Amino acid sequence: WYPLGYNIRPKRLQTIAREAVAQYGGQLPSDEETLLSFKGIGAYTAGAIRSFAFRERAAILDTNVARVLFRVFVGRGDPKSHAMKKHLWRLSETLLPSRHVFDFNQALMDLGAMVCVARSPKCPACPMSKSCRSVKLNR
């Protein structure tokens, strides 16, 4: 539990909840800057809150989304490098549709969790396989 940060998450959630009650009447704000001011809320969580709770146009980049974007659009290199993460964030923001962002973000997360998995990805079942850089580079 400790290496994954699971031990601290409940405490951070309690702190965020207390701050939301004290300063915002129990409601989380929807603007990115304010969300990022909460200790324990980073770029991914702020984007997820804005996208899923408020249906706003906000990019997300969790492990699954990063894997999908890296494989489909990049294919080679170190997906965990700082420069690559910045590139993947920009890509995530660029690809956002103007409407149905909730569905788009959820679909990317699901694709990474169920098809474009870390080990033994199910490339033949992937709707992106025909344009996937990783598939093309590994043939």
Regions found by a protein language model. Give the residues of each.
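Catalytic cores of DNA base-excision repair glycosylases
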Residues: W1-P124, M128-N138
